[in-house]
From Swiss-Prot:
Job of this protein: Component of the COP9 signalosome (CSN) complex that acts as a regulator of the ubiquitin (Ubl) conjugation pathway by mediating the deneddylation of the cullin subunit of SCF-type E3 ubiquitin-protein ligase complexes. The complex is involved in the regulation of the mating pheromone response.
KW Nucleotide-binding (keyword) present: no
Keyword Nucleus appears in the UniProt entry: yes
Keywords linked to the UniProt accession: Cytoplasm, Nucleus, Signalosome
Biological process annotations from GO: protein deneddylation
Subunit structure: Component of a COP9 signalosome-like (CSN) complex.
Protein name as it appears in the record: COP9 signalosome complex subunit 9
InterPro entries from the UniProt entry: Csn9_fungi
Main location per the UniProt record: cytoplasm
GO cellular component, one term: cytoplasm
Superkingdom of origin: Eukaryota
Upper lineage: Eukaryota, Fungi, Dikarya, Ascomycota, Saccharomycotina
Length: 158
């Protein structure tokens, strides 16, 4: 059973960083859930894993997945958001965009069905190999970020 602290962290709309608790957690099930919230997006997870998550965890994971998508591009269309966040309707997309505005300033264009990132307020956790993760190495890992920066620097000198 999920401890009350973890439940409160998941239900708190202002919390998106869980690494501190993941590092300290001793319970295997809770550690796995915290790793998912720290480092993965909803589309990274096996279907049997997402099927076992409750509504609050899925809602939080959708916000986190949207933030990951916003890190990749300053403009995202509704279809990309639906695919990345496992949503069905434009109404669900717009509700998610509004919830994400705690963490990123967005310009939402309902007619063009896209959102433009104006400013990032906070970023998601980054995996640095502190301890094992339940699935593949997360995209937001220290190694991947350093590699991307090296490639970017090389592209500037070419």
């Amino acid at each position: 059973m999920m401890r009350e602290l973890l439940r409160n962290l998941i239900e708190d709309k202002t919390v998106i960083n869980y690494k501190k608790w993941w590092m300290e957690c001793k319970d295997a099930q809770e550690t796995k859930l915290l790793a998912i919230l720290c480092f993965y997006d909803i589309d990274d997870l096996p279907e049997e894993t997402t099927a076992g998550l409750d509504k609050f965890v899925l809602d939080k994971l959708r916000v986190l997945s949207l933030l990951s998508l916003c890190e990749l591009s300053t403009e995202v269309n509704y279809q990309e958001i639906k695919e990345k966040c496992d949503l069905k309707t434009d109404g669900e997309v717009e509700k998610l965009l509004i919830r994400a505005e705690l963490f990123v300033d967005l310009k939402i264009d309902s007619v063009a069905r896209r959102a433009t990132v104006l400013e990032y307020k906070i970023s998601r956790d980054v995996y640095s190999g502190e301890k094992g993760v339940p699935f593949h190495t997360p995209v937001r890992s220290k190694i991947n970020i350093l590699s991307a920066l090296i490639n970017w620097r090389s592209s500037l000198t070419d």
